[in-house]
Amino acid sequence: MQPAMMMFSSKYWARRGFSLDSAVPEEHQLLGNLTVNKSNSGKNDDKKGNKGSSRSETAPDSGKTAVVFSLRNEVGGLVKALKLFQEKHVNMVHIESRKSRRRSSEVEIFVDCECGKTEFNELIQLLKFQTTIVTLNPPENIWTEEEELEDVPWFPRKISELDKCSHRVLMYGSELDADHPGFKDNVYRQRRKYFVDVAMSYKYGQPIPRVEYTEEETKTWGVVFRELSRLYPTHACQEYLKNFPLLTKYCGYREDNVPQLEDVSMFLKERSGFAVRPVAGYLSPRDFLAGLAYRVFHCTQYVRHSSDPLYTPEPDTCHELLGHVPLLADPKFAQFSQEIGLASLGASDEDVQKLATCYFFTIEFGLCKQEGQLRAYGAGLLSSIGELKHALSDKACVKAFDPKTTCLQECLITTFQEAYFVSESFEEAKEKMREFAKSITRPFSVHFNPYTQSVEVLKDSRSIESVVQDLRSDLNTVCDALNKMNQYLGV
C-alpha cells in the first residue's frame, strides 16, 4: 500500500552615502529644532520579526529615516554635527540645506540617513547633549515594520533565504525506521547518506548536481514508471496528460532513465516559473510552504528500495517526478500552489496547520471533474498505483472541496485516506483558497515580486503604492492590446 506523500512531515504539525566632512563649510553651531520624518524601512530577519541588523553600515536592509535640524551661524557647527552621524555609524545617503523658516540667522539641514534603531537613538542622545535646545518630534512609529513584525514567525523575504528553510530538516533521508524496506541494507543506507550530503551542500543559484543512478535504482524507477503510465490515460487529469509527453521529450522521462532535477527545473521555469531544489528529507510545513511562495518545490533525489518498487514510506524521486512535476508545469496549478505558500508566510502555527492540511487534500490527494468524470491531480495519487485506483472507485468517499471543512480532515500517512476532495477546476480551488486565506490572522498582506524574487510586506500606503504602480503598468499593456485588436477588427 502506498502511503500519503508530502515533502513535509505530517508528524510535526505542532510546531538602503557618503562622507560630507570635506563637502560642507565650517560655519555653524548646532542649536535648534530637530525633526524626524518617517521614511521607508526594510528588515533583515532571524528567528522572529524579520528584525533589522544593528550595524547600518553593513546592513543594506536597515531602517531609513530623515532628520531636519537648524544651525546657528558659527564656524565648525555643521562638521561637528555630521561627525556625530559618523561616530554612531549612521549612514548619510542624502543631504540638503535651506534657509530656516523660523529664524533668518539659521540654516536648516536635511539629512536622509540609514541606520538601525539603536544607532538612531544613540545619535539623538548625543545631539541633545551637545545642543542647548533639541526638540524631537518623531511620527508615531519609526521602523514600524520591525516593531509590527516582532512577534510574527520568521519567513524568508528573498528567494536566497530558502537555503535556511531547506537545511532545517526534521527527518533526514538517511535516517530509516526499523520497518523501512532498506533498514538492514547498508549499501542502500550509504546511498541515502550520499543524497543527504548533496542536498545539504546545495545553495540557491547553483546548478543542481547531476546524479549517476545505479542500475538497480534505474530498474526500480522503471517498474514504477511503467506501471503508473498504464493508468494515467484513464485516471490522470487533462493537464497532467498534456505535460507528460513534454517531459518525455525535454527531460528524459523514460522507463530506462531517471530524469535529472536540473533538467526538470529548467523545463518548469520556462513553463510556469517554478523551479525545484534538492532537499535532504522532511521539512516542517512552514518551511515547505515557504518554498511554494517563491515557486520553488523541494525535491528528493533518492530512489525507493528495490525490494518493493511499488511501496515507499516517504516521498522519493519517483513520487516527486511522476506525481508533482507534470502539474507544476501547468500555469494555473502553479499559481494555485504559490498562493497556498504565500498565505502561510508569517501565519500562526494553527493557520499553517490548516493551510498544510488543505495542501495535503488538494496538491497531494486532490480530485477534479473533467468531462463528467473524476480525475486525479494530487501527486500522492498519481504516484501510487493502489490509491490511484481506489480514489476513483466506488469505494472511496468523495466530498466537495471546501477549505473550511477540509482543513479539519485527518491526514493519514500509512493507509488510504478516509475522504478525498473534489473541485470543478483548479480555478475554483484557487478562488476558494483565496477566500479562506482572508481568515488568516496577519497584521499585513504579502506580494511576490517576480523581478527581484522577493516577498514584499504590504502594511501601509507606501508599500501598497508600489504594487499599484505595477498593476497600472500591466493594465496599460492590456488596454493597449485591446485597442489594437479593436482597430484590427474595425470595432
Curated annotation (Swiss-Prot):
Its cofactor is Fe(2+). InterPro entries: ACT-like_dom_sf, ACT_dom, ArAA_hydroxylase, ArAA_hydroxylase_Fe/CU_BS, ArAA_hydroxylase_sf, Aro-AA_hydroxylase_C_sf, Aromatic-AA_hydroxylase_C, Trp_5_mOase. GO terms for biological process: aromatic amino acid metabolic process; serotonin biosynthetic process. Pathway: Aromatic compound metabolism; serotonin biosynthesis; serotonin from L-tryptophan: step 1/2. Pfam families: Biopterin_H (PF00351). The modification Phosphoserine is found at residue 19. The keyword Zinc does not apply. GO terms for cellular component: neuron projection. Residues 66-141 form the ACT domain. Residues 33-63 are annotated as: Disordered. One of its GO terms (molecular function) is tryptophan 5-monooxygenase activity. CDD domains: ACT_TPH, eu_TrpOH. It is an enzyme of class 1 (oxidoreductase). Gene3D superfamilies: Aromatic amino acid hydroxylase (1.10.800.10). Keywords: Iron, Metal-binding, Monooxygenase, Oxidoreductase, Phosphoprotein, Serotonin biosynthesis. The keyword Lyase does not apply. It catalyses: (6R)-L-erythro-5,6,7,8-tetrahydrobiopterin + L-tryptophan + O2 = 5-hydroxy-L-tryptophan + (4aS,6R)-4a-hydroxy-L-erythro-5,6,7,8-tetrahydrobiopterin. Interacts with DNAJC12. PANTHER family: AROMATIC AMINO ACID HYDROXYLASE, TRYPTOPHAN 5-HYDROXYLASE 2. Belongs to the biopterin-dependent aromatic amino acid hydroxylase family. This is Tryptophan 5-hydroxylase 2. The lineage of its organism: Eukaryota, Metazoa, Chordata, Craniata, Vertebrata.
